[in-house]
Amino acid sequence: MSLHRSEITGALDKNKAPLYRLAKSEDLWERRIAIVATLYFIKHGKYEETLKIAKTLLTDKEDLIHKAVGWMLREIGKRDMTFEEMFLKQHYKEMPRTMLRYAIEKFPEPKRQKYLKGEI
């Protein structure tokens, strides 16, 4: 059986509780599914769930989680840079470096450097 991620997460459009449960799981892959599954919402212009789950995962110890969260933040920024920066300005100093680097990958170089140097 092959289900596309958006088919699965589309079913979560009404009840998002499973995503939050996965985000708090001890299993790395369940936490990663929680954040990557929010791409469905991002593609539909809904960023709130991604940002809530990203906040939950800020202190995660796993590099794969850092990369996934940074990736989803970058996806938000592709659609609404203001929304991404609102989150980053509040949290970039506490974010794991890999997460921050992934999130700001597409920023203009001067702005990227300011984030990396903690000057925002």
Put a short name on every predicted segment.
Residues 1-120:
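Alpha-helical scaffold domains
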